[in-house]
Amino acid sequence: MTIARLQRSVTLADVLVHEAGHAVAAWELGVRIGAIHVHMRVREGRVTFASDVGLGRFPAGSDALRLAIEREMVVLHAGLVAQKRFHYEGACGLVPRTDYEGILATALQVETDLRLIDEWSDYAEERARALIELPQTWRRVEALAVELARRPVLHGKEVDAFLAGVRVPRTANARLAYRRREAKERYCLSHNPEDREPVERAIAAARRTR
């Protein structure tokens, strides 16, 4: 579960992109989505997903368990990463407390050294950045943000069906999502305020047609 409670400088579009970032990352990584809820008037959003961690699905201490935890950490980071990609100035200094609490609680299932958890979280954040930077991922984030303006409550199967139907650009190398250093260096350079305008207009139009 992830909640974004946002400050005055953050727009409704920022909230929608934040939640879309969580959901698209989950969809891309095979983490099952429960539902997305966006409360328009208070600019608050929530994504729930069906965690595979802690259910006894993986042997304790196994590599499979650590990979499942890491996937969920990437999903939890992806909301703020997408928001910064969309509107960097509006996200500066923002701390989505519930996202970070979720990251810590998830990692604590296999690791108790907080220093190592911080390093692991940094790595998961880099993976989230690289994933969100992929053209096809970002196109899905934009499309889902606009759809959430029309339908602020979407359940997992609806999200799956919608994202599967989004037309996305082809990418030459899907492994780009895991090129950590290049993604980190490129991250702040990729933000262009003009990229925000078409999405904000589409969100405004979608709200008028509700």
Language-model-detected regions and their locations in the chain:
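Soluble catalytic regions of large protease machineries
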Residues: T2-R210
